[in-house]
From Swiss-Prot:
Pfam (any one): STIV_B116-like
Alphabetized InterPro entries for the sequence: STIV_B116-like, STIV_B116-like_sf
Gene3D superfamilies according to UniProt: Uncharacterised protein PF08960, DUF1874
Domain of life per record: Viruses
Protein name: Uncharacterized protein 26
Record organism: Sulfolobus islandicus filamentous virus (isolate Iceland/Hveragerdi) (SIFV)
Length: 118
């Protein structure tokens, strides 16, 4: 499954071991991915969801859910270039452009069950 998230957090299950492939995408590459694959939004703020909808020309609904990645799952993540002040929410594409962001695609390529750490 492809998920879209507005943070750099990788939602991994505790106690598991992962190998993740990461690739930075252009806006065009991200648009193509969202147009061609089913995805679930895990974007937790309405203003951010609207902003991402404008950037990608694909409807990104606000959907404040908790997700965990499994084998083969992909995560499209919008990562700000600067950490925001506490409580600050970006409300416009212009604000986002001013702060700057990168688009990353993370894919779980190996997911080990029942890993024991020593």
């Amino acid at each position: 499954m492809l998920y879209i998230l507005n943070s750099a957090t990788l939602p991994l299950k505790p106690g598991k071991e992962y190998v993740i492939h990461a690739k930075e995408l252009t806006i065009e590459e991200a648009k193509e991915l969202l147009e061609n694959e089913r995805f679930i939004s895990a974007v937790g703020h309405e203003a951010t969801a609207k902003m991402l909808t404008n950037i990608f020309d694909v409807e990104i609904p606000m959907n404040r859910i908790q997700i965990f990645l499994d084998d083969g799952d992909k995560l499209l993540s919008i990562i700000l270039k600067t950490r925001l002040e506490e409580g600050k929410v970006i409300k416009t594409v212009e604000e986002l452009e001013q702060i700057g962001y990168n688009i990353w695609l993370f894919e779980v390529v190996t997911y080990e069950h029942n890993v024991k750490y020593e």
